[in-house]
Amino acid sequence: EDSYSNTVSLNAETTENLFNDLGYDLKSVRLGEKVKPIYLTKLPRDLNALGNTNKKRDLFIKIVLPLILNENQKIREDREKLFHILSKSFNTVGERVWLKRRFKEYKIDDRDLAKLKMRIDIIPVSIAIAQAANESGWGTSRFALEGNALFGQWTWSKKGISPKNKDPDKTHKVLQFQVLKASVRAYKN
C-alpha cells in the first residue's frame, strides 16, 4: 500500500507553475503528446482563487487526467490477465486467487465470468472527467477538498462526509478518500 504521510499541499498557482515547468499543457495533449504522469494526492484548496474559469477548468483537467489514464492502464493489465486466464484449460492456484479477488473487487458473484469480462473495462476518459467536474464543482466542492471525493459516491457504512442540510431521514455520506487516486480507483466499481 502506498504511504502518503509525507505529502505536501500545493496551491493552484504552484500547481500551474509545476505543470508549465514540466511542459504539461492540454493543447499539446490534444495534438497527440503523451499526458505527463503527474499524480497529485489532493486538489489545490484555492482553485476558485484563479478567477478565470477556463484556467480553473484546465488545471482541474490536468490534475484528474493522469489519474484516470493511470487507472485505465491498470484495468488494461487486469483485462489482459483475465483473458489470458480464461483462455487456459487449467488455472494455477494463484490465477484462481486472482480471479476471486477481482470478483470481490467488482462486487460480482464469483461464477459470473461474463459479467466480470464486461466490468473489467477501461473508464471512458471524457465521461470520467465530465462526471468528476460535475460532482466536484471542478474540484471546488467541500467533498472534493476535504475528502478527495471526485465522483460523489455515496456510502451508508464506510468513512464519509455528511452533506450539510441533508434530509434528516437520509443516512448517507459521501465517500471520503485519503488521496485522489483512491477516488478514481473507486469510480471504476
Tell where the protein language model's regions lie, with residue ranges.
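Catalytic cores of secreted/periplasmic lytic hydrolases that degrade extracellular macromolecules
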Residues: E1-A130, N134-N189
